[in-house]
Amino acid sequence: MLSQRLQCSKQFARHLSVAAKDGSGKVSTLSVQVQGGSRYATKDGVAHLLSRFNFHNTGNKSALRLVRESELLGGRFQSTVDREHITLSATFLKEDLPYFVNALADVLYKTSFRPHELAESVLPAATRDAAVARACPVAAAEEALYSVTYRHGLGKPVLYDGVEKVTLEDIKAYADKVYTKENVTVLGQGINEADLKRFVNDSLLASLPSGTSLAGSGNAKTHSGEARLRHAGSSVAAIAVPVAKADFATYEVLARYLTSDLYALSPLVHKAKLDKYTDGGLFSLYVKSAEAAKAAADIKKVVADLKAGKDISVARKYAALQLAVENDSAASPVSLKLENAKDFKLGKFNYVAVGDVSNLPFADEL
């Protein structure tokens, strides 16, 4: 690590997983990861709506009181959703750890789920989230790649779009399903692990009900295909490759190589990344341009170059450095044997065109 060596350990108290990494700084970050992302959703968008319900009124505190108290302590809360998790997090001064452990526990255990909050706050916020995502052609391309590749499970939409009706009872039922000990992991950054474990055991987190672990229960079956979406603004052409866990190192190095100065065509690549899940991953690459003709030319060049084969071993140390820096500030570090990454040759892939699709290529033209 580039900073001082940090001690990391995991504890399992009554099926509740707790992991922490201490540090010498004055600021701590506490996260509660819930295995309840969109891949596990009982209805499209219910995970997003549940995430948006976090930090509203609970049985012990009003939303206003919760916000005001945290502000007086200089802290802040956040709730996010992705395909794997709903994550509740708080950033605060180290000495205020007990308050924020109890605050997050209160949200998971005693959120009130009041009808007026759904209509007046949760739905408008979720609708805004979806509108922002729809306005971004890269986000639209990513959503389409997942839909094409997985169809179900990981292919479900992350954000609520209003297509499938979700009621307050649906949200409460989903909370009951995912807010259980088996689906919750408490992560601390800049926090002493023994202290965190003690405060967690003294909080309502220890009183969460038992349930069924959802990890690995999502449908990760993959498919081949392409999609084309008309979209005003910039045009995006994107490809995706499903990745087995055994190949994570190769695609991690590849993603970082493609956006580095080590790759001659990196100026053409808008974004490349590897999304890692419990049962596999998805590598995706995006080309973006205000002109569809340029996006078309760029994706053809990049795909042709990758089909010819690349020696990505030159990027192993670059990728290792980036990963080390990220791990240094992560409560849950990623461990990959990057030295195994050598040659890469692009084979089958899924393809999505977003924007001026009349002037973007089809998959069989790449």
UniProtKB/Swiss-Prot annotation:
Belongs to the peptidase M16 family. UQCRC2/QCR2 subfamily. Component of the ubiquinol-cytochrome c oxidoreductase (cytochrome b-c1 complex, complex III, CIII), a multisubunit enzyme composed of 3 respiratory subunits cytochrome b, cytochrome c1 and Rieske protein, 2 core protein subunits, and additional low-molecular weight protein subunits. The complex exists as an obligatory dimer and forms supercomplexes (SCs) in the inner mitochondrial membrane with cytochrome c oxidase (complex IV, CIV). The gene is QCR2. One of its GO terms (molecular function) is metal ion binding. GO terms for biological process: mitochondrial electron transport, ubiquinol to cytochrome c. GO terms for cellular component: mitochondrial crista; mitochondrion; respiratory chain complex III. Residues 1-15 form a transit peptide. Pfam families: Peptidase_M16, Peptidase_M16_C. This is Cytochrome b-c1 complex subunit 2, mitochondrial. It is a peripheral membrane protein. Keywords: Electron transport, Membrane, Mitochondrion, Mitochondrion inner membrane, Respiratory chain, Transit peptide, Transport. Component of the ubiquinol-cytochrome c oxidoreductase, a multisubunit transmembrane complex that is part of the mitochondrial electron transport chain which drives oxidative phosphorylation. It comes from Eremothecium gossypii (strain ATCC 10895 / CBS 109.51 / FGSC 9923 / NRRL Y-1056) (Yeast). InterPro entries: Metalloenz_LuxS/M16, MPP/UQCRC_Complex, Pept_M16_N, Peptidase_M16_C. It comes from the Eukaryota. It is found in: Mitochondrion inner membrane.
